[in-house]
Amino acid sequence: MSRLNINFLGKELKNNVITSSGCFGFGEEYSNYFDVNELGAVNLKGITLNKKDGNKGTRIAETPSGMINCIGLENPGIEYFKDNIIKNIKYSTPIILNINGATIDEYVKVAEIANEIERVDFVELNISCPNVKNGGMAFGASCESAESTTKAVKKVLSKKPLIVKLSPNVTDIASIAKAVEDAGADSVSLVNTFLSMKIDTKTRKPLLGNIFGGLSGACIRPIAVRMVYQVYKAVKIPIVGMGGITNYNDALEFILAGASLVSIGAGIFSNPILPIEVINGIDNYLKENNISNIKDIIGAAHL
């Protein structure tokens, strides 16, 4: 058995390195850079019930050690995805489908369709979306809304393990993680992007078309690692850790803090083969330190 093999929610993965939703398209786009089958899993671009064109205006802004994006969940919708895209995916790597909604009813409808797509191995529930029936507050902004959304989706998701992606824009992320665990989540992934903005000093206006966007990149990593550490102490379900990973050592920090899987996001944009470098780096680390399997160091930083 490989040092990197890991059983995640009943599925055997060849390693614990995956890609983040929104940074890897549907996977095929990166096949010219490396063999996607080398990844532990692929997390696909976020899907909604109906097609979304995304936000107008500028969508991406560079910032020191990171980037701000407000793509607006541009995607073809779950039905088109089911009937066209998923059928044409050639790689055999396990797939995580990231689902989104503007209401709990929308989440449930997307989950019902995802539940019947055989090629999808896991569903990731993105609760950072704004709840249009609750003044735009994100579904993951409180324990109550996070729990009710998770419970509703879990009820119809009978064939797939449920990962809940947590927002970092909260006061106590550990309490929210515990709430979604109690609601039936099989795993939590964290962190999503941090709410931020950039102002164009020439026009004296917000640079992004949506005014606010999500900050990602190396600048958020220390905060993300801290949050993974806190959540690991609060829940018993496995954690997918992410936020600013640019090399294998960054990934190891998340693993030592308590992440079973690590997810590579914005770092791919500047280094398309980063996931493979991280896989090889972790493997060498385990070999050099005589560690038989990656699971032996998950959460090892806890005293």
Swiss-Prot record:
GO biological process: 'de novo' pyrimidine nucleobase biosynthetic process; 'de novo' UMP biosynthetic process
Cofactor: FMN
Entry protein name: Dihydroorotate dehydrogenase B (NAD(+)), catalytic subunit
Reaction catalysed by this enzyme: (S)-dihydroorotate + NAD(+) = orotate + NADH + H(+)
InterPro entries assigned to the protein according to its UniProt record, in alphabetical order: Aldolase_TIM, DHO_dehydrogenase, DHOD_1B, Dihydroorotate_DH_1, Dihydroorotate_DH_1_2, Dihydroorotate_DH_cat, Dihydroorotate_DH_CS, Dihydroorotate_DH_I
Function: Catalyzes the conversion of dihydroorotate to orotate with NAD(+) as electron acceptor.
Main location, first listed in the record: cytoplasm
Gene Ontology MF annotations: dihydroorotate dehydrogenase (NAD+) activity
Location of the active site: C129 (nucleophile)
Cofactor comment text: Binds 1 FMN per subunit.
Cystine pairings recorded for this chain: none
Binding annotation for substrate: K45, N69, C70, I71, G72, L73, N126, N192, T193
Pathway where this protein functions: Pyrimidine metabolism; UMP biosynthesis via de novo pathway; orotate from (S)-dihydroorotate (NAD(+) route): step 1/1
Lineage: Bacteria, Pseudomonadati, Spirochaetota, Spirochaetia, Brachyspirales
Top-level taxon: Bacteria
Subunit structure: Heterotetramer of 2 PyrK and 2 PyrD type B subunits.
Compartment list: Cytoplasm
Entry EC number(s): 1.3.1.14
Family membership noted in the UniProt record: Belongs to the dihydroorotate dehydrogenase family. Type 1 subfamily.
Cellular component GO terms held in the UniProt record: cytoplasm
